[in-house]
């Protein structure tokens, strides 16, 4: 068996959630491979709308295995709120959601660092969501991160060391902050996380494939926000392209099957960065109004413009897209 990958071909917000909603019934497993709570997938199930930040979209299908892979960064406080809201609406997930031990944790100080770094940039701001994504991936790459699996071993010591490092940086930036409420909610989230099944996602997914199970890998954001292939430095901090499914889940490249590339009939972008086809007139405003172009997580108004076929061709190339799906053509 091979894994299929679903991803965005523009700057995110292409309508991936709706496509996932249609595709998930044919898969046994749905796995998130990158990103964090900075992006939301909007889905409709049984007449009710949901916005998922970290939890895979297969959670609404009662018989699916859902996996949060090692490439994801997880905020325990936001995860707890998201999971409890799902459970309250009749979607239990403790038995059906598996979390990679290798996924990195977003600490309260990561969120404060995110705000401090953005403030220090002045006019050169990237326009982050302030969820601590960048600082968390920075710690991951510099080998200073705290992972989900660390919750089970010497957690207090590892957390204290990371927190102390961050506080030194914040001191050097002369950034004022209050950690009390953030840390309280975060520690409650850590206790909540302990109820879930922690796995080595690379082994789990490959074993499921050996057993003949079908797997859909779910990406967040879009190709033009990829840390390597996007409009750097106005990008996210993870690999949003198809190859990210390999590194974010532990799947070999020759295991990739179909690659679903999602794009809109026009383009949108949130935050700063180049946008060649952007519209600054009433046409752009009308597209935004008719398309309800506001961020699912941030609520920020999206910049709107004509479809960029040059950028779309590039995204198809770097992802090896096998199936193109156009959204909002109506």
What positions do the PLM features span?
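Non-transmembrane, aqueous-exposed alpha-helical and coiled segments at domain scale
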Residues: 1-330
